[in-house]
């Protein structure tokens, strides 16, 4: 893992790294905000997945997350949206290939060789972060925008024990029923139903998280054709999943919209991460009799 740049922000650091990925078979780039609290203890991590055409730079430069992360002691990780490189397959269209990995593992050529973004986000990158940065093991949440909102919701719904919470800005909620999703799933050779948030929530048959936060601009040019927020809302209602969908008149699909509500999402995840950390401490106190017995030997005694 190679550090490429560092910038101070709100008492912490914005760092950009590159590393050789075993999942994609390419060098991958990500950025991370390390809050000032990391100098004292390991911090919980929020993963932010970006949308079509983006790199890690878009949200870093325009998302407005750092002040809230600094105040609440959360690290935030910004992965790239696809593998890149001269030998990586691409398409002339903006919604396929580089910048459009859709957070799935492709099985069809020419994409199967490198486009393993599901494995990269769910396995390789968290392990890398927890091994090399002051990240609290297992304390992570996930959010995203548009294609990244699709990735955040589906990844969290498929593995609820791995994530404390999930949220999204203008997510692609029902990709099997929209042109973007249908095109990507067909090209990459993946089972769309296994990567459709609406379908996954219906299949769960019950609430998966205490709450899911979604912000949606009502002037979003993609709302009617591509996003499927109403379908996700209906699925949530049918299984008893609380979803806080906030619909905002006048807001579009851009980072002007995202930055207006980013702090709310950081707070939403910080609360969930803190609760998960507290529950983990309770679990240890209740179940780890050996640890309690060892602690009792030293209680009230000087430690040398």
Predicted regions and their residues:
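Non-catalytic cap/lid and distal C-terminal segments of serine-dependent acyl enzymes
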Residues: 1-304
């Amino acid at each position: 893992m190679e550090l490429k740049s560092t910038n101070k922000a709100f008492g912490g650091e914005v760092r950009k790294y590159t590393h050789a990925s075993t999942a994609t078979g390419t060098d991958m780039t990500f950025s991370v905000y390390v809050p000032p609290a990391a100098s004292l203890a390991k911090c919980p991590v929020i993963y932010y997945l970006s949308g079509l055409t983006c790199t890690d730079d878009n949200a870093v430069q325009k998302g407005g997350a750092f002040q809230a992360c600094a105040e609440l002691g959360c690290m935030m990780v910004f992965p790239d949206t696809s593998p890149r490189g001269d030998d990586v397959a691409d398409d002339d269209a903006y919604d396929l290939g580089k910048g459009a990995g859709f957070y799935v593992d492709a099985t069809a050529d020419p994409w199967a060789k490198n486009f393993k973004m599901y494995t990269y986000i769910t396995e390789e990158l968290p392990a890398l972060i927890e091994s090399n940065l002051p990240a609290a093991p297992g304390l992570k949440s996930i959010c995203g925008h548009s294609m990244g909102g699709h990735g955040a919701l589906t990844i969290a719904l498929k593995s609820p024990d791995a994530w404390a919470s999930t949220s999204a800005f203008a997510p692609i909620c029902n990709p099997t029923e929209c042109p973007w999703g249908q095109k990507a799933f067909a090209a990459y050779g993946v089972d769309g139903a296994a990567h459709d948030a609406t379908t996954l929530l219906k299949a769960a048959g019950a609430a998966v998280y205490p709450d899911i936060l979604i912000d949606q601009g009502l002037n979003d040019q993609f709302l009617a054709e591509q996003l499927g927020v109403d379908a996700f809302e209906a699925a949530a209602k049918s299984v008893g999943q609380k979803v806080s969908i906030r619909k905002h008149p006048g807001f579009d699909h851009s980072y002007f919209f995202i930055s207006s509500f980013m702090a709310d999402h950081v707070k939403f995840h910080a609360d969930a991460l803190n609760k998960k950390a507290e529950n983990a401490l309770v679990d240890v106190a209740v179940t780890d009799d050996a640890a309690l017995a060892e602690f009792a030997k030293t209680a009230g005694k000087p430690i040398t």
